[in-house]
């Protein structure tokens, strides 16, 4: 058993008491990102090693793997703790997003180790989508690079407010303060173009040698700030979803018998109480909460992030993809939106194309109307383009086949974030964050029967070359 884990269990008075204590610790999700070979995997390995989170058999295996695949000579190659794919070990790089878990006396952590190569930017965006903090590694010898800027921008685009700029490999520049100061100034100059509400911190360190990772460095006495671990343990994470109105996307209709009908999902934001009046979108029908069912039994109130099943007092038509919110809240469904897109496919994104889109539990089709601009990650300027290439980031105008209940992504990532799915291969080809909503066309001016709407959708889906217009919106072909 891990020695520090055994000591923690003993200090708490047994396994059960230790598990209860773990449940009450706050959780921080963070990712490491930056350019290739900046030392992201090594840093995570060092964090795990210096916090004594590695079991004896893992340490023994690491010694053997370091001899076969290591890139650090006689030293332990801590990056091998994270780089698990055979291709990663052979090339000495990270390709996939690797997740690791550890805890200290103050906090629990989930780490996402993301790749640095530009062609794997899509993997980095995937890792960043669930994180609260980003560690941006910079090689002290190279300074701020294009990929550093790209990852910084993607992190802020995905709503991350806390950035820790870890200037790594200080041992290779003789721990010089002027090198740290120069890179810090360069990054702050670039960061002037990022959102103004960011919490940016700088830590000089050496992941290989352990300087300023979990313990203060004797080689950089000119630095009086906290170590990286101290920053992670003390950073104050304020979750925006706790302060946002109630949003409950229905993932599953739970009907185990004739006497029970519940609507299961994860509460995306806000809170809900028994007896509270709620409204169902897109239908607009209202009811009230009769029960809040959880794995541990019924509750009187649930908060954001909890997996629950809601039982209502009325039998109303609710299905997967519907959204429940407080009855006094106003959220008008929209068919048109401007979306920040991170494109992840070899085939460029271009106007006129149609994709399936998935938002929470809702799946529908969307058409690309226009690309307003692509963002140049070197200087964050906007440029006109006809298409968005692989790993490109831009603002795109879209029209959905049906009105959707959407929020702005920065206000609610669950109901404001979506993915693009190729209709033929069923592969995820892009990620989108709602920037602007346009409610025009959300309600049709002409009433059509259910049969007419179903027939129209059938024709547009299976016979796109007929160029049939969408009865619920603008005239266009459903390509």
From Swiss-Prot:
The lineage of its organism: Bacteria, Pseudomonadati, Pseudomonadota, Gammaproteobacteria, Enterobacterales. Its EC number is 2.7.7.4. Keywords: ATP-binding, GTP-binding, Nucleotide-binding, Nucleotidyltransferase, Transferase. Residues 113-116 are annotated as: G3. It catalyses: sulfate + ATP + H(+) = adenosine 5'-phosphosulfate + diphosphate. GO terms for molecular function: ATP binding; GTP binding; GTPase activity; sulfate adenylyltransferase (ATP) activity. The gene is cysN. Heterodimer composed of CysD, the smaller subunit, and CysN. GO terms for biological process: hydrogen sulfide biosynthetic process; sulfate assimilation. Residues 25-239 form the tr-type G domain. Belongs to the TRAFAC class translation factor GTPase superfamily. Classic translation factor GTPase family. CysN/NodQ subfamily. This is Sulfate adenylyltransferase subunit 1.
């Amino acid at each position: 058993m891990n020695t520090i884990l055994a000591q923690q269990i003993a200090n708490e008075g047994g396994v059960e008491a230790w598990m209860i204590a773990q449940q009450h610790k706050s959780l921080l999700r963070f990712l490491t990102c930056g350019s290739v070979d900046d030392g992201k995997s090594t840093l995570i390995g060092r964090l795990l090693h210096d916090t004594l989170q590695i079991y004896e058999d893992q340490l023994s295996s690491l010694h053997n793997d370091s001899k076969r695949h290591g890139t650090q000579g006689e030293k332990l190659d801590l990056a091998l703790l994270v780089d698990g794919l055979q291709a990663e070990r052979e090339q000495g790089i990270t390709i996939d997003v690797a997740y690791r878990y550890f805890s200290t006396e103050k906090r629990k952590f989930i780490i996402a180790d993301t790749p640095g190569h530009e062609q794997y930017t899509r993997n980095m965006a995937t890792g960043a989508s669930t994180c609260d903090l980003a560690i941006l590694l910079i090689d002290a010898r190279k300074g701020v690079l294009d990929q550093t800027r790209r990852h910084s921008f993607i992190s802020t685009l995905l709503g991350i407010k806390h950035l820790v700029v870890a200037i790594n490999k200080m041992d290779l520049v003789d721990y010089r303060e002027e090198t740290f100061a120069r890179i810090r100034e360069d990054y702050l100059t670039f960061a002037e173009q990022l959102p103004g509400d960011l919490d940016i911190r700088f830590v000089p360190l050496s992941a290989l040698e352990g300087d300023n990772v979990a313990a203060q460095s004797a080689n950089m006495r000119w630095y009086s700030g906290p170590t990286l671990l101290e920053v992670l343990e003390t950073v104050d994470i304020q979750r925006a979803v706790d302060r946002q109105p109630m949003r409950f996307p229905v993932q599953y209709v739970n009907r185990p018998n004739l006497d029970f009908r519940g609507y299961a999902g994860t509460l995306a934001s806000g809170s809900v109480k028994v007896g509270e009046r709620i409204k169902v979108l897109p239908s607009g029908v209202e009811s009230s909460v009769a029960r809040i069912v959880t794995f541990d039994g019924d509750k009187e109130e649930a908060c954001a992030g909890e997996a629950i099943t809601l039982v209502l007092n009325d039998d109303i038509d609710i299905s997967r993809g519907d959204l429940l919110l407080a009855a006094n809240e106003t959220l008008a469904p929209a068919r048109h939106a401007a979306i920040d897109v991170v494109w992840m496919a070899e085939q460029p994104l271009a106007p006129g194309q149609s994709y399936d889109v998935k938002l929470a539990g809702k799946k529908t089709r969307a058409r690309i109307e226009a690309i307003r601009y692509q963002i140049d990650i070197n200087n964050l300027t906007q440029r006109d383009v006809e298409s968005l290439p692989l790993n490109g980031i831009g603002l795109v105008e879209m029209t959905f086949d049906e009105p959707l209940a959407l929020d702005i992504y920065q206000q609610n990532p669950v109901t404001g974030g979506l993915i693009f799915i190729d209709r033929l291969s069923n592969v995820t080809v892009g990620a989108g964050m709602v920037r602007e909503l346009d409610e025009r066309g959300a309600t049709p001016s002409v009433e059509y029967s259910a049969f007419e709407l179903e027939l129209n959708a059938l024709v547009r889906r299976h016979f796109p070359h007929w160029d049939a217009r969408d009865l619920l919106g603008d005239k266009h072909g459903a390509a």
